[in-house]
Amino acid sequence: METIAKHLDVCQEQLLELYEENSNNLTKHIQHWKCIRYECVLLHKAKQMGLNHIGMQVVPALTVSQTKGHQAIEMQMTLETLLNSDYGMEPWTLQDTSREMWLTAPKYCFKKQGQTVEVKYDCNADNIMEYVSWKYIYVHDTDKWVKVTGHIDYKGLYYVHGGHKTYYTNFEKEAKKYGNSLQWEVCIGSSVICSPASISSTVQDVSIAGPASHTSSSTTTTLAQASPALPTCTSEERVDPPPCKRPRGPTTNTNNARDTVSVRHSDSVDSTNNNIYPNSYNSNKGRDNNFCTATPVVQLQGDPNCLKCLRYRLHAKHKTLFVAASSTWRWTCSDTSSKHALVTLTYVNEEQREQFLNTVRLPPTVTYKVGYMSLQLL
């Protein structure tokens, strides 16, 4: 047991040094996965010997350490092939080479420089989902890596490799999941892309509302594939009425019918829907600031293994700067699919917490929030 504990301490110390170094060198990240692989081997052997704890660390079940070890081997071998490619000398962060990123859509590819894309389903501002469009995607093709660029159109997020367009997010499938109709709007920065269903619905509404002399006119709408930098719904003329909502009050000008329809740019303002309402969730009135009997806490968030190593180091080197540290935990009722775990630290008072934050250097992959715990600790 002492031999395993000694080797485990050395392994976790190396992991902490790699986290704190936050290198952009791919060889460092290969070393990181080698350490995780070795750690899993030690924990697997300890469990086979009947050990449930090594120091303060709980020894996981055999299947857990075995599965995580296999994942570490996969990541190590994949990164080694990437190192030998044309892109091995590019800057790579620890987040770029994490397993979470590896399994993020598009799966089994490395990604860089993501941009948030908002999709509004059913033209409802309260039904918005966020996705990530990647600028660069590294695809493994047989025996080599290929670097391609990501694109966006009304159908979804995709990349082109070998003349084949591969969608890794399909907005129509997402609309069936999150919406009640096959209508959606894609917002990228200041540009808006609309689904064909949204455009046809808009054309029909405007034609009915127009004068009788224009109902038989032909309607032309052009939809272009878009890049994040340019508006993508264009046409010969522009119409002010919004595509998804009817005016709430009577219109004063009935002589402005148009023969063609375009989807409005996100910078345009609809005068009939320009009211601003206060956000009741942001109101601080009546807030109870009576924290005099509450316990100051810091909640750490990050990779479970990183948090375990950090907690071990805190107990070893900074145990006078906090009172207690929880085990790693997660919210069980959360709707998110985040793999991050949490660790809660408690303090005697705010001064001790402030001293902790000013003294302890947290790894770049760990974030924190400060707060209070109203329950008394036993």
From Swiss-Prot:
Biological process annotations from GO: DNA replication; DNA-templated transcription; regulation of DNA replication; viral DNA genome replication
Any one annotated GO CC term: host cell nucleus
Sample GO molecular function, one term: nucleotide binding
Claim: Transcription is one of the keywords in the record: yes
Region entry Transactivation domain, spans: 1-200
Modification note: Phosphorylated.
Keyword terms of this UniProt record: Activator, DNA replication, DNA-binding, Early protein, Host nucleus, Phosphoprotein, Repressor, Transcription, Transcription regulation
Spans annotated as Disordered: 209-282
Record field: compositional bias (Low complexity): 209-232, 273-282
Signal peptide extent: none
Chain intervals for the UniProt region annotation (DNA-binding domain): 295-378
InterPro entries in alphabetical order: E2/EBNA1_C_sf, Nucleotide-bd_a/b_plait_sf, Papillomavirus_E2_C, PPV_E2_N, Reg_prot_E2, Regulatory_protein_E2_N, Regulatory_protein_E2_N_1, Regulatory_protein_E2_N_2
Broad class of the protein's primary localization: host cell
Location in the cell: Host nucleus
Sequence ranges of Polar residues compositional bias: 250-259
Keyword Phosphoprotein appears in the UniProt entry: yes
Binding partners and assembly: Binds DNA as homodimer. Interacts with protein E1; this interaction greatly increases E1 DNA-binding activity. Interacts with protein L1; this interaction enhances E2-dependent replication and transcription activation. Interacts with protein L2; this interaction inhibits E2 transcriptional activity but not DNA replication function E2. Interacts with protein E7; this interaction inhibits E7 oncogenic activity. Interacts with host TAF1; this interaction modulates E2-dependent transcriptional regulation. Interacts with host BRD4; this interaction mediates E2 transcriptional activation function.
Family: Belongs to the papillomaviridae E2 protein family.
HAMAP family hit by this protein: PPV_E2 (MF_04001)
Primary role: Plays a role in the initiation of viral DNA replication. A dimer of E2 interacts with a dimer of E1 in order to improve specificity of E1 DNA binding activity. Once the complex recognizes and binds DNA at specific sites, the E2 dimer is removed from DNA. E2 also regulates viral transcription through binding to the E2RE response element (5'-ACCNNNNNNGGT-3') present in multiple copies in the regulatory regions of the viral genome. Activates or represses transcription depending on E2RE's position with regards to proximal promoter elements including the TATA-box.
Name by which UniProt lists this protein: Regulatory protein E2
Lineage of the organism: Viruses, Monodnaviria, Shotokuvirae, Cossaviricota, Papovaviricetes
